[in-house]
Amino acid sequence: MRRYLEHFLDLCKNRIFVMLCGVIVLFAIIVLRLFSLQIIHGEYYDESITASVSKTLPVAASRGNIYDRYGRPLAVNTVAYCVQVDGSVTLELNREERKTLATDLTDWLWADGHHKVDSLPITTSSPYSFTFKGTDEEKEKQEKSWKASIGLEKKQYKLSATECLKYLYEKYDVPEGYTAAQKRTYLSLAMSDDRNLMALTLARKLSEFGETIDDELPLDTEAPYAFQFNGNTNREKSWKQSMLMKGKELNYNSRKTLDYLRDFFGLPEGLPEQLVRDTLGIRYSLYLKRYQQYQTVTIATDISDKTLAYVEENQDTFPNVVIDTVSLRDYPEGEYFSHILGYIRQMTESDYALYKDEVDADGNPLYSQTDVVGQDGMEKLYEKELNGVDGKVLIEVDNQGRRMSVIDSTEPVAGKDVFLTLDSKLQKVAYDTLESELRTAVLRKLTGGGKTYASSTELFTSMINTNHISAQKMIQAEDGVQKQVYQKLKQANPTFSPTQDDAVAVAKEFLIDGLEKGSISLKELMLMMIEQENLSVTEEEKTSIENGASPTALIIKKLSNGEMSPADTGLDPCTGSVFVTQVGTGEVLASVTYPSYDNNELVNTFNNAYYNDLLQDGNTPLVNRPLKQKKASGSTFKMITALAGLETGTITPSTTIVDKGLFKDAGVPYARCWIYSNTGGTHGPVNVSHALEVSCNYFFYELGYRLGSTANGSDSNKAITTLNEYMAAFGLNDYTGVELDEYGPTMASPANKEKAVKTFNPDATTSQTRWTDGDTIRTAIGQSINSYTPAQITKYVSTLANGGTLYKLHMVDHIQNADGTLHSEVEETVENVTKFKEENLQAVYQGMYLVTNGSRGTLRTAFNDLPVKVAAKTGTAEEDKNRSSHTWFVCFAPFDDPQIAITVMIPFGEGSGTPAPAVAKAIIREYLGLDYTPTNTTMQTVLAE
């Protein structure tokens, strides 16, 4: 026994035996652990792993298209190439690739004058030392941490700064021939992690190739990189907290936040600001998907062939950067239809709350938070029809969230197509003619060829007021003339701050006041507008302005050749709207807003800068004017008063009323006929048709007053009750029924007067709110508190033209399935039918005919060259005593067989010539094909056996 023990002790002294025992013990532990994992807990871990590696990815369905009445495309999908980063593919740059990328970036930065890229914690000149800050203990800790981060072992922690530089030069293979400063730039880049080198390279190349980076970072993409929270401080704070900002960091402005993000993502210091912003856009998009790396991240869409070739050529370097195809939304007619179509965009939180409960036939959700949905117009209204059903791909991913394989897939189902009642050619003719006529009107003002003249001071004041010379951009500018003018503002107002609540208003007032007093010149304002890219000029033109050429002359030149729009000047009249319907169906043929916007700028890659400019534009291009701009109807209302008088027997078609100039029966202030106000004359005796021809206010004052006639005199309530009945018969008491969002009408009535008065004076007395004869007679000529949209007026004129049938207006004709079969159709809806006496209708029609054809008609020469007869009426409505009155024009055509009704409304358009009738005339010519010339005039005969 003793011998065995001695032998065992001898073995224990043998190193090989000890090592063998250790191996046996370790092997036993491994076997036991495997037994536990696979046998005892195998089922549990199997279920856990299976649940964690199966992920479902949506396959986007093709969105339905939108067409006009003839099948012309208005909203379609196009296929484009995009650059994506696939997080499931590992990026591991080798030594040579890292050197190539860092060298390329270094050479580019130095060639571009950026010599301060340096993230090394080492002084820039010999003798080199570390630049860590704090107590000795803190500095020692920082130094050790940094040395560990660059790959030094503990035994190398005593290396000096000079020795560390030498170590880095060798490790990162710093190119020969670089200066000391260039070497530091190179090292700052080469030491960045692989994702930063990739993002920096891509950001630089995408910018070089003219691409727009798809960006979710809520900072403007150009200096001064303002936040995109539209003043919502709660959203700003919440976002900052999501980026781990805290304490004082929550009060950082946008530029400090940019610096914070640069450090957060580990980008080198000293990089060009724009490159940092672009790179952060890429890094931030990847950061948002850090827990879903199986989902690719799109960083550029609709790329050029040059970008595609670059990505393909560098596939070995960046295997995680891929080219894919994507479906983009395209609006071929852009600004012509933007207010009707709207646009699509990735859904917001409020959108998701609206759509999250939508499910398909199997109960599966139809929407996810990353889906795009309609944000306005038809795109929003018919979202559920246009949106298809997404397909699915079931994939297997590893525990890092990276894609491994495809398990199963389901094909998507395309959305339905929507066909509108609108005629795109008619719409474009209306828009282009309206813009052309407004251009002519503004040019007359600037050149003194019209009734009113606009001075250079008025022109530039208008451009400041409408933000085409932006005070906001001026106070944010970092250089140029804008900065010089801003310094003038600071000298005049030392306490001014760009962050004060009324900063823009104060700056705008300073510019206008300075212009009037001469402390700010037209040249400075013109150069500001050029710097803000609100006016495109050649170098020669810019130099001529700098050398003293007339800014106004250049504006006139740009306006004349179409490089500048009338809306850009801000001078009245520079806005307008047109609405056209079929008189016998309620179909809308055209709905024009001017100025408009290009919805292509807001789809696919949302242009925040463009959208902010739209929001600040004083001409309100985002407003859908035909449906949401209400004005007093003026004399276009008089046909209703005429029919009310005729149908109630108050007058007959032959009844004459003598115009006395002043109408005194309704009390003071006395109402005046327009001709009396202008010339002191009168229209003399006129019947209803001739009263419409010359638009005699006195005739309709008298008629409105007579509608209240009783045995004891006049009853104003009786008169307005009668007028309200006929206003309702023409739809002026309700919405038009059109599918898009619209404002309701304001019909002059006792209830609406009381409401209006108490809105401004809650303590108004009964005598102040009661309805009077003065209210009635002013209602009879379309004034008082009457207020309607062009769509509502067109519905009224359409009803008049067809003899009394009130149709619900509609813009959608039918909806079609993806396979071409009919899904649904919008049928005509008759809301009311009023049986007017034929002789009464003819009397009113005759009056409207005389407007364009009578010897005294207000438009007797406007339609001379049109081969068809037109029934029309004009109207004006005053809103601001310092500006021209609004002008209305309504008509239906042809006179002997009415097919279409047209309304043109031009705010502040009185005295600008006849733009509205010219627009209507162009519409009639297009609709009736009067300018159509066959492209093939050769008669062809086809013989069939």
Where are the regions a protein language model picked out?
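Short, gly/Ser/Thr-rich active-site loops of penicillin-recognizing serine hydrolases
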Residues: 821-829, 921-945
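Beta-lactam-recognizing serine transpeptidase/beta-lactamase-like catalytic domain environment
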Residues: 81, 130-132, 136-150, 154-157, ...
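Short, hydrophobic-biased amphipathic alpha-helical segments
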Residues: 303, 307, 916-923
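Short, hydrophobic alpha-helical segments
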Residues: 438, 801, 927-931
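Short, charged, low-complexity patches
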Residues: 419, 423, 427, 431, ...
